[in-house]
Amino acid sequence: MELKILSVAIATTLTSTGVFALSEPVSQVTEQHAHSAHTHGVEFNRVEYQPTATLPIQPSKATRVQSLESLDESSTACDLEALVTESSNQLISEILSQGATCVNQLFSAESRIQESVFSSDHMYNIAKHTTTLAKGYTGGGSDELETLFLYLRAGYYAEFYNDNISFIEWVTPAVKESVDAFVNTASFYENSDRHGKVLSEVIITMDSAGLQHAYLPQVTQWLTRWNDQYAQHWYMRNAVNGVFTILFGGQWNEQFVQIIGNQTDLAKALGDFALRASSIGAEDEFMAANAGRELGRLTKYTGNASSVVKSQLSRIFEQYEMYGRGDAVWLAAADTASYYADCSEFGICNFETELKGLVLSQTYTCSPTIRILSQNMTQEQHAAACSKMGYEEGYFHQSLETGEQPVKDDHNTQLQVNIFDSSTDYGKYAGPIFDISTDNGGMYLEGDPSQPGNIPNFIAYEASYANADHFVWNLEHEYVHYLDGRFDLYGGFSHPTEKIVWWSEGIAEYVAQENDNQAALETILDGSTYTLSEIFETTYDGFDVDRIYRWGYLAVRFMFENHKDDVNQMLVETRQGNWINYKATITQWANLYQSEFEQWQQTLVSNGAPNAVITANSKGKVGESITFSSENSTDPNGKIVSVLWDFGDGSTSTQTKPTHQYGSEGEYSVSLSVTDSEGLTATATHTVVISALGGNDTLPQDCAVQSKVSGGRLTAGEPVCLANQQTIWLSVPAVNESSNLAITTGNGTGNLKLEYSNSGWPDDTNLHGWSDNIGNGECITLSNQSNYWGYVKVSGDFENAAIVVDFDAQKCRQ
């Protein structure tokens, strides 16, 4: 079946970057970062070997280790032309002078530069120089070694993709010598962020150079040595996570394949790593998931390790839950084990279907053409999402003059919108449920529209930074893809024989944002301009956000505003699948309208719309004064002359920095509208969660926008938000290992009841504690529990409440 796939973003996620079960599982994942890229990814999932590209994405400054901030080289001026030289000594000097940030640009440098910089002579000589430096490494990090190993693996990346680069056979032995020199130092297993920066490059070089077979002892050692002390350091997590890249890449290395089946110590280490209880819910949980995934992949090999592999997998499926505690590891292991082995051997057959019912348990029908399956949305969110899609549908048909007539052979009649509770949940569950990659911000699967009964799927997640009416990330943009595919483009995703990315992404941005796209105006002002001919040739290769989205938007908007009749004529061709005529049409536009396009841009930015920015706290209490500020709002070519606040409770203000008090608890959507001296306006929204004066500051107060639990296990000391449902059953392990136990609930709205038992799920006959105050503030304290498990029941009519269990606590949180 043909899939029309438009994946949003290349953001790294907590669980799988690969497809699940029906398609071959792929590589491990990387750590989730504070930023989220929200751009479209590559259409098809990667199932063949490729060297790892570029430097890993670094953490935001807010999470970066303070002592490493001086290493941020983002402002370094790079001169790749200076690297074009026949002298290896000069190249070494220039590489070390410019540093890793500039060497990183060689991954995407033009072919001419790569062919010069990565000659066999240069690779050999730099590997030898790296060996000399590595032998003298005493730990504590080294900018020089980090840069040199990055250069070496960039060379293999260039060789893989550049047909004009082919290394002579003596290059790889020299590279191996440099890796060996580093591995053999006394500092190889050091624990520090600075060391981790170098170690990361060394470990990925092992994979990129095709040396996966040579370093299995070191892989095993890292898995065995890993502990909570290592896990505290971001760069160590990033570095050691590379061992899973080695295990993944090894499947295309014959020497690796010949020996991996007998690596019993490695199989045990993978299983033990995946079963590390302290990793669950911790910052290295993604690594435990990767360990489970690579353990499952070992089932494809035969040898002495097979029994250990199966035993360790069985332990994972017994210790963790498919949907609950440790599910990231459970699902990762099930991903590969169900593909390479007999699923019945582990009792995991058809787990994907069961998982979908558990996760996407809410159903909401917007109309005969739109149905929502969601994990944890309120009725108000459902209604708001439906309303937004309904508005866009009307605006789309009006703007593109479709007559609401689908293209020929398109039998899609209802879109299914699948919404996960968070990007983390999307990362964990969307892969196995929909058989997609989740290293992105969402995905649209059209399926095969020519098949009657086909159901296209938009797969998304909630995010606090999304539209505050519904909090569904990319809803507006992605819904346009559905409409565009059904009413503008003949066939499925692979049908066009000419490039249409500029149109697909541009029209989605234009309909979703209309004339309010500050990012597009800013890309004109920063000088990163593209001609019409360049825009029309845009692909997803390289994921140039500006070119794909901003300039796609600008080209579409320009044509709609200045040449609408030409757009209508182009759509005649795309709706019939006449791609040769389509290509001739846009080529003519590029020749006729480039000068006009440039003038239009200048007119646009000379009277650019302002940018509204709200600065305020996101939570407060009833009767508490909250300060709101519009002072960070900007205008590209004038000044902001007026502001209008709507606080979401019927109150307004025209002050630039007002204060406001809310009279009742709840979630309020605050909007700010700013107007500039040219009369142009812009709007921003901000959500404020107000709790009652009796709320609990020690518990989450923003559960309206956070992930919620609808069941499963509680971890002592870790507050969680409760799902908005009548009854929730929760278990607490190891309650008999603590002398005292306190269970606290609070915040949100409504009225809940809290019950506890140490001898099974609470009912009228076995209660050991209960609390039923007015509101959500409940407290149970207990001591000397006899049994291992504690059982909690939360019931009532409530929303956005939180709960926490504390061990060795004689009183509840206040």
Curated annotation (Swiss-Prot):
Segment forming the signal sequence: 1-21
Catalytic activity: Digestion of native collagen in the triple helical region at Xaa-|-Gly bonds. With synthetic peptides, a preference is shown for Gly at P3 and P1', Pro and Ala at P2 and P2', and hydroxyproline, Ala or Arg at P3'
Domain PKD: 609-697
Protein name in UniProt: Microbial collagenase
Active site annotation, chain numbering: 478
GO cellular component, one term: extracellular region
Annotated family: Belongs to the peptidase M9A family.
Propeptide stretches in the record: 22-75
Ubl conjugation recorded as keyword: no
